[in-house]
């Protein structure tokens, strides 16, 4: 299901190409989040797997512009645009082009709104989106993400599955070209996880996401094009989802055996 809101200033590309050219990030405390990495991502469905602390979130932060590379460069391209997150003007445009999802996190303002419909409507209103378009946007999102029945509920009244769905709907409310999602099904049981994944991957948007759910990425209906395995702050495998899961399983087994030795 596609989407209709488009800013008038610049055309919205159908998808993006993310390029890391020896790009890495070291945090202020000296901890290496991601070693210098060369990678280009243009596929529509890309998964990132790895153990806790391996560097997945840092990689996603470089892709969505929430982290700046302090080694190498990051370029985000779409249509005729080539954007550098380190450039202030480009960073603002990237915020518009890349929707960010962090588990079930939603803006704090959502908890202050009387309803989740109002919570999504208010930012659109502030950006002077006409009422007819706002209603179409919200109706589209709430129908697709199964939120219509709880539209008048407050964010705090939602269960975990609905909050995950709302987090994705929120990221899509300004119709970005791509979604970068850090563990969009974290903490959910098998049924709820499948519901959220189906809604996310059936929406007509490019998705780059991190997960620990290796079964999810190998399910044919989600059509994952490519999977990266991150370990020890670097990408150690880049290929198809089934091959990536086999590699990852062997990697974990080797770490376990080494720990026993």
Question: Which residues make up each language-model segment?
Answer:
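Helix-to-loop junction immediately C-terminal to a conserved catalytic motif
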Residues: 64
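ABC ATPase NBD coupling module
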Residues: 81-101, 126
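Q-loop/switch helix immediately C-terminal to the Walker
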Residues: 104, 112-126
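Conserved ABC ATPase "signature" region
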Residues: 133-150
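Conserved ABC ATPase signature
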Residues: 154-158
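Catalytic Walker B motif of ABC-type/P-loop ATPase nucleotide-binding domains
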Residues: 179-183
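Conserved beta-strand-loop-alpha-helix hinge in the C-terminal portion
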Residues: 234-258
């Amino acid at each position: 299901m596609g989407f209709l809101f488009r800013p008038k200033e610049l055309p919205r590309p159908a998808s993006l190409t993310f390029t890391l050219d020896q790009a890495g990030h070291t945090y202020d405390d000296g901890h290496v989040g991601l070693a210098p990495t060369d990678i280009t991502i243009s596929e529509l469905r890309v998964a990132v797997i790895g153990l806790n602390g391996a560097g997945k979130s840092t990689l996603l932060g470089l892709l969505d512009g929430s982290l700046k590379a302090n080694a190498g460069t990051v370029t985000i391209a779409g249509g005729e645009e080539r954007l550098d997150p380190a450039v202030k003007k480009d960073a603002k445009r990237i915020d518009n082009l890349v929707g960010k999802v962090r588990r079930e996190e939603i803006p704090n303002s959502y908890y202050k709104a009387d309803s989740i419909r109002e919570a999504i409507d208010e930012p659109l209103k502030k950006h002077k989106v006409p009422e007819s378009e706002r209603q179409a946007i919200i109706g589209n999102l709430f129908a697709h993400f199964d939120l219509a029945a709880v539209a008048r509920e407050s964010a705090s009244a939602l269960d975990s599955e609905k909050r995950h769905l709302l987090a994705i709907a929120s990221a899509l409310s300004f119709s970005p070209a791509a979604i970068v999602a850090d563990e969009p099904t974290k903490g959910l049981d098998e049924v709820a996880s499948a519901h959220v994944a189906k809604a996310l991957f059936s929406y007509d948007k490019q998705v780059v996401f991190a997960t620990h759910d290796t079964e999810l990425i190998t399910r044919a209906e989600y059509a994952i094009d490519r999977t990266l395995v991150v370990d020890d702050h670097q990408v150690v495998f880049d290929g198809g989802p089934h091959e990536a899961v086999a590699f990852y399983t062997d990697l974990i087994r080797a770490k376990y055996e080494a720990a026993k030795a």
